[in-house]
From Swiss-Prot:
Natural source organism: Klebsiella pneumoniae
Any one GO cellular component localisation term in the record: plasma membrane
Topology in the lipid bilayer: Single-pass membrane protein
Protein name: Type II secretion system protein J
SUPFAM superfamilies: Pili subunits
GO-annotated biological processes: protein secretion by the type II secretion system
PANTHER family named in the record: TYPE II SECRETION SYSTEM PROTEIN J, TYPE II SECRETION SYSTEM PROTEIN J-RELATED
Gene (name only): pulJ
Length: 198
């Protein structure tokens, strides 16, 4: 009686190792693709969240706009290209509704606010005082990055206008156009309803 060995042959072992190696490479590739997709999804989600926060901040500001002149300006509302140190559009106005609980802070509830594009960043500028003293510096907040263009259009008297020349009145509506990397142009319309100028 000849006894046969019940182990694996060298060829069978090499074949099993080759299959295991191929499965391992496939698993690592799938894992890398999943991790890359997760990173891209997080980046896009963060970008969309920042865009939504920007438009929410603008909506909060524009919904509280008031027809008020600051001490050093003859206009109620200012908007133009390449103004306020902007690389494109800029807008400046007064708004009500800046919280001052029980009047404890040494300031008004009225705030002067501006938006401008500088170095591919959309900035919001505001002063601590209703009528800032000459030489006062605003608080500058970067509200959105990777912005290529910041455009404004104004609605009044039943039509849209590319420029606002009526310094003594507020427009009825405002169109904000942001050109973003990599999304392109995104437009948002705001209804301007002047509030109380207490």
């Amino acid at each position: 009686m000849i006894r046969r060995s019940s182990g694996f042959t060298l060829v069978e072992m090499l074949l099993a190792l080759a299959i295991l190696a191929a499965l391992s490479v496939a698993a690592v590739t799938v894992l890398q693709n999943v991790m890359r997709a997760d990173t891209l999804t997080r980046d896009k989600s963060g970008r969309m969240q920042a865009l939504q926060q920007t438009f929410s901040q603008m909506a909060a500001d524009f919904s509280q706009i008031i027809p008020r002149r600051s001490r050093d300006s003859a206009s109620l509302f200012f908007a133009g290209r390449f103004q306020l140190g902007s690389d494109d559009g800029a807008i400046a106005f007064s708004r009500n509704g800046w919280p001052n609980p029980l009047g404890l802070l040494p300031r008004s509830e009225i705030q002067n606010v501006s938006y401008r594009l500088r170095g591919s960043q959309l900035e919001r500028l505001n002063y601590d005082q209703q009528d800032p003293l000459p030489g006062s510096q605003p608080t500058v907040t970067i509200v959105l990055r990777d912005v290529r263009a910041f455009g404004l259009r104004f609605y009044a008297s039943g039509r849209w206008q590319d420029e606002w020349q009526q310094a003594q009145t507020l427009p009825q509506g405002l169109e904000v156009t942001l050109t973003l990397e990599p999304y392109g142009e995104i437009r948002r319309l705001f209804l301007l309803t002047p509030g109380d100028s207490r």
